[in-house]
């Protein structure tokens, strides 16, 4: 669908994002999401959720899911999110997400979902054995965003297509139910440096919690010694660092480590090269390790402290869920009226 703009959304700006509780968070999550969430809370009304409904599109251990939800919440707070500024909550605690998702399933077209490349990547050769939830995942994502009438969504490369689908669903709903401007057409917040952190063992693969090698990633719960050891053992090449970004781009592992340094230091890659061009990794790695420990070790310490008192975390999540429901309920009530449901 193409955007039509005779009537635009007139509500207040709001940002929404979430992370699945499907494993330990790592440096890629920290630089690609958590740091940006922390910054956004000071600039715009911010809703950050734990995406547990999305997590169960693939099997999750029921005995571990609640604790994994706490771990994501602990990571949010340890990274600098303030529960008094940002609304932090578990997705499953706000039933309006699921209700709006069903309505959107009836608005979205099958052809739109057939074009979603992420389902093809995640289902692989076993599409017939994948859950229906994995296929309709982008529709729930649209409901996550639009139940709060979020106007901005931080996205990486792998989520841009889903945000376009959200815009299509919003536009079609507004048109079908004669409600111009009811839902916003959310804009992407394109993520800058640090948005794509690669494996420490393979510069061509994204850093991932599913990689069998723990040395491929820096976990947020790693100790200072763990962090330093992983940086020291990170894969590199024998050449000194180059002078230009163009040369750096041809060396995947070097490019990744320089990118990590730049993101942690709040610099550009060019600025890092200005300091380290011509120097070998015997000089660069210790500097990167020191910076990574300085940046990440306190986050791990705060996380461990928060997880040591689950009652406090649960209270934060319950309060956030209540606040989220207060924002979501009026939207769903209006949607039901527009659709024409009995009693609405």
From Swiss-Prot:
ATP binds at residues 20-22, 28-29, 156-158, 197, 206-210. InterPro entries: aa-tRNA-synth_I_CS, aa-tRNA-synth_Ic, Rossmann-like_a/b/a_fold, Trp-tRNA-ligase, Trp-tRNA-ligase_bac-type, Trp-tRNA_synthetase. Its main location: cytoplasm. GO terms for molecular function: ATP binding; tryptophan-tRNA ligase activity. Keywords: Aminoacyl-tRNA synthetase, ATP-binding, Cytoplasm, Ligase, Nucleotide-binding, Protein biosynthesis. Its EC number is 6.1.1.2. SUPFAM superfamilies: Nucleotidylyl transferase. This is Tryptophan--tRNA ligase. Homodimer. A motif ('KMSKS' region) lies at residues 206-210. The keyword S-adenosyl-L-methionine does not apply. It comes from Caulobacter vibrioides (strain ATCC 19089 / CIP 103742 / CB 15). Transmembrane segments: none annotated. The lineage of its organism: Bacteria, Pseudomonadati, Pseudomonadota, Alphaproteobacteria, Caulobacterales.
